[in-house]
Each structure stands twice: as C-alpha cells, then as structure tokens.
C-alpha cells in the first residue's frame, strides 16, 4: 500500500502546512525532540500527534502498513504514551513522576518512544518544573508532543523548550468535505460526524464505528423522550447511555489483553507494569473521549432545536433526526433550549473535573427535562 494512502500524516489534508512540515522533518531526520501543537479545539492537533508518532516510530518514515504503524493507528503501541490531566485542577505530580520514571526505560517494540501530553496548558508550575530538564535534553530516541490552545496560557518555560507548530481553525464545511472524500458518504452526514467527533480524522473513525453511532442515537432518543419521562425513565436512559458509550472499549480491552499475553514471557516485571499502566491510561482516555462525544451529540441536537425555534428553515447539523428536533422545538421555547444547552455545557465541565460520568449525565438529563418544560 502506498504511503500517501496509508500513513496518518498523509491523511491530514485539512492542515496541509502542518502535514508537509512534519513529513519533511521526519524524512530529513531533523525532527525535534519536543513539539508544541497550538490551536483551537477541533483543529486536529491530537490527530496530528498520533500521525507524527507513527512516522517517528516507523523505520520507513510512516509507511502505514508495518507493525509499528498499525499499532500506532489503533492507539495500541506500547511505546506511544498518551497523557491527559487526571484531576480537576490539572496534571498531578504523580503523573509527571510516572512519565519521568518511564522516559529512561528502553522501548518495548520500536526503536524510539513518543509521549503525547494533551491539554498541556494544565501543566502548572508544581508539575511542570520536574519535566523541564527532560524536555530540554531528553534521551536519544524520545519525542515529546504537547498539545495546547495558545502559547499565552502555557508556562513560558515549557514554550521555550518546544518547537511550536500552529494549527489553523478548519471550517465545518471544509472538514465535512474532507470526511466525505475519505468515506464517500453524504456531506450532510459527514458534517454531523465532524460536529460530534470533533475533527475530520475522528469523524471518519466515527462513521466506521457502529458502536459510536449507536451511542449518538441513544443520546438523541434519551433527550427526545425527556418531555414525557419520569425520574425512573431518566435514570434508566442515563444507565443505558453509559453502557453504549463503553461498548467500543471491549475491542480495545481485548487487543490490550492479547498484547500483554504475547509479551508476558520475555518482558521484565517492570516493563509489564509499564505496559499495564499505559493500557489503563488509554482506556481512561478512550472512555472520557466517548463521554465527551456523547455530550457533543446532545449539544449539537439542542443547538439545532434552538436554531429551529428561531427559524424553521434553519440549516441544522443533525439532518437525520429532524423529527426529534421538531418535537423538541414544539415542546419548548428559546429560553428552554438555551437552558438545555447550558445543562450540556455544565456536564462537559463536570467531566473535565472528573465527576463520575453516570452522575454527570443523570444531572444533565434532569436539567434538560426541567429546561424543556419551562414554557
């Protein structure tokens, strides 16, 4: 398979300058030891981080088909470590210590290692200071990729030690076109996928996942049923939503267990513990991503309801559930739809603060039900 068709970097067609810059850096052997990807949410920074990790670990600069490339694309490579803040206030000191303890260890499968640090603006002074020396002079074959919204909200000492890569904001129309080209699906459906999943690459993955699409359908049905729902109905819907969101994790867990089994005979106890910790982080990150995707489904739905209340001919994102949008619009008013959107935003903040997902969704559904009935 040709690299242009298979590599993750080649698929970053909504960020051409970033794609070309990173491709040339890896191919020329001049890749930096530390990058800081800067841009608004939805610009594709995380997609680019995984793409760069794939190219860096591949012995052919990201062929897309070797064992390393396939594992990185599936987010199951033991030498790519993904970190996200584990507390409401940001990164824990324990997370930084774990990362620093891991850096000197030899790679498990590849000849190098990559550390992706998401929401790096949440690296505060007490957690970042220990990381500074390693960022400045990491061991050979180690790459750090930090993701943030703006250099202005980052610690200057972090910014100065990284090569900054700006990402432009991609319009929804351009993103939908990219997904449509990649999948051959209807542009309207692709627009919905980007709105729910957050970026073109994740939109493509969303359209390939029956489980993720089912979670979205269940969220739409849950909100559609709230007008007539009693408390037991709401709690039941919330429970079903959590089950649906976790459904895609079964395949991830199965793959992780197979990798552990394959490596059990020749890896040291420390290396196995390292792999188990990485698997746990990956599952937690995937679950959080699934919850946020479900909440994005709720947000786009209620946005469409609000737009419809203001203009019946409004251009909505969720074309395939216009009946639900119409029923909700008929049952409430602008104030109610606005309060419902605020309930979704509160749930998103609660998840970011590590509130239990089921509790966050239960509270959101009850608040939306109350908001819809305000007329």
PLM regions with names:
Residues 116, 145-146:
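Walker B beta-strand of ABC/ABC-like P-loop ATPase nucleotide-binding domains
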Residues 1-126, 130-136:
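Clamp-loader machinery-focused feature within the broader ASCE/P-loop NTPase space
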Residues 1-54, 68-71, 140-142, 149-297, ...:
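Charged, glycine-rich active-site and insertion segments that engage polyanionic ligands
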């Amino acid at each position: 398979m040709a690299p242009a068709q298979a590599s993750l970097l080649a698929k970053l067609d909504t960020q051409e300058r970033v794609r070309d810059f990173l491709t040339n850096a890896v191919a020329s052997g001049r890749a930096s030891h530390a990058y800081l990807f800067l841009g608004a949410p939805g610009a594709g920074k995380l997609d680019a981080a995984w793409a760069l990790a794939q190219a860096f670990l591949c012995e052919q600069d990201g062929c897309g088909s070797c064992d390393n490339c396939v594992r990185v694309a599936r987010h199951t490579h033991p030498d790519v470590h993904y970190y996200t803040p584990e507390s409401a206030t940001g990164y824990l000191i324990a997370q930084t210590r774990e990362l620093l303890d891991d850096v000197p260890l030899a790679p498990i499968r590849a000849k190098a290692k990559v550390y992706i640090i998401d929401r790096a603006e949440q690296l505060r002074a007490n957690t970042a200071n220990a990381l500074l020396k390693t960022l400045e002079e990491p061991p050979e074959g180690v790459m750090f990729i930090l993701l943030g919204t703006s250099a202005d909200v980052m610690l200057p000492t972090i910014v100065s030690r990284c090569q900054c890569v700006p990402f432009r904001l991609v319009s929804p129309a351009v993103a939908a076109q990219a997904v449509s080209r990649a999948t051959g699906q209807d542009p309207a459906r692709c627009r919905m996928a980007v709105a729910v999943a957050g970026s073109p690459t994740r939109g493509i993955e969303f359209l390939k996942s029956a489980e993720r699409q089912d979670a979205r359908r269940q969220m739409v049905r849950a909100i559609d049923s709230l007008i007539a729902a009693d408390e037991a109905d709401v709690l039941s819907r919330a429970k079903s939503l959590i089950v649906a969101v976790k459904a895609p994790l079964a395949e991830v867990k199965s793959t992780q267990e197979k990798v552990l089994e394959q490596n059990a005979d020749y890896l040291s106890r420390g290396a196995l513990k390292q792999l188990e910790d990485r698997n746990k982080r990956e599952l937690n990150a995937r679950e959080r991503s699934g919850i946020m995707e479900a909440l994005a489904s709720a947000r786009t739905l209620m946005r469409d309801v609000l737009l419809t209340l203001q203009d019946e001919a409004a251009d909505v994102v969720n074309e395939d559930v216009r009946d639900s949008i119409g029923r909700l619009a008929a049952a409430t008013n602008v104030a109610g739809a606005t309060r419902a959107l605020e309930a979704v935003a509160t749930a998103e903040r609660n998840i970011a603060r590590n509130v239990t997902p089921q509790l966050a969704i239960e509270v959101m559904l009850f608040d939306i039900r109350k908001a819809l009935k305000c007329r």
